[in-house]
């Protein structure tokens, strides 16, 4: 098992009574994020509609880490609902509320209620890059072949 890191969480008033993110199984990579909507005021996503859903949480990640907000596979497979900017990135220096941009690609309206598990959050180490401008790049077998240049058939 990998070592745990400490992430400080600030619960905002509209998330009172909701559970904090947690791993559902011992092998889980992501923790579920929960909709912190007002009780009795569901959000309905019509087909093709998108909305920013509050989680009621702000986090302080350690330096050198990020959190990625990713879709829940069950929501995508069963309802066509996914995270629009997947993965959404929460930087270690961001201190605002974590919100999830959901979009409904399904054929039917999708209702989000208080406590609905809407996305998953994966905390990962970050590697920063330093770009070095050069005149030419090393040659490779692929070269400048772009989208679809390697075909679709298995080898």
Curated annotation (Swiss-Prot):
SUPFAM superfamilies found in the cross-reference section: dUTPase-like
Summarize where substrate binds, as residue positions.
72-74, 85, 89-91, 99
Functional description taken from the UniProt entry: This enzyme is involved in nucleotide metabolism: it produces dUMP, the immediate precursor of thymidine nucleotides and it decreases the intracellular concentration of dUTP so that uracil cannot be incorporated into DNA.
Answer whether the UniProt record assigns the keyword rRNA-binding to this protein. no
- Which keywords are on file for this protein? Hydrolase, Magnesium, Metal-binding, Nucleotide metabolism
Protein name, entry field: Deoxyuridine 5'-triphosphate nucleotidohydrolase
Q: Which GO terms describe its biological process?
A: dUMP biosynthetic process; dUTP catabolic process
Q: What is its EC number?
A: 3.6.1.23
Q: Specify the pathway.
A: Pyrimidine metabolism; dUMP biosynthesis; dUMP from dCTP (dUTP route): step 2/2
What are its cofactors?
Mg(2+)
What catalytic reaction does the record list?
Answer: dUTP + H2O = dUMP + diphosphate + H(+)
| CDD domains for the chain | trimeric_dUTPase (cd07557)
């Amino acid at each position: 098992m990998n070592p745990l890191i400490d992430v400080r969480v600030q619960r905002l008033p509209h998330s009172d009574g909701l559970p904090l993110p947690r791993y559902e199984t011992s092998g889980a990579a992501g923790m579920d994020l929960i909709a912190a909507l007002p009780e009795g005021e569901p959000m309905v996503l019509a087909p093709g509609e998108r909305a920013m859903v509050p989680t009621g949480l702000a986090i302080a990640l350690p330096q050198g880490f990020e959190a990625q907000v990713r879709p829940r596979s069950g929501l995508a497979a069963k309802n066509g609902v996914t995270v629009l900017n997947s993965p959404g990135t929460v930087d270690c220096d961001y201190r605002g509320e974590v919100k999830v941009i959901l979009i409904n690609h399904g054929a039917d309206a999708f209702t989000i209620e208080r406590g609905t598990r809407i996305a998953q959050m994966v905390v990962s180490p970050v590697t920063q890059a330093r770009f070095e401008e050069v005149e030419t790049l090393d040659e490779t077998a692929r070269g400048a072949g772009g989208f679809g240049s390697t075909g679709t058939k298995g080898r």
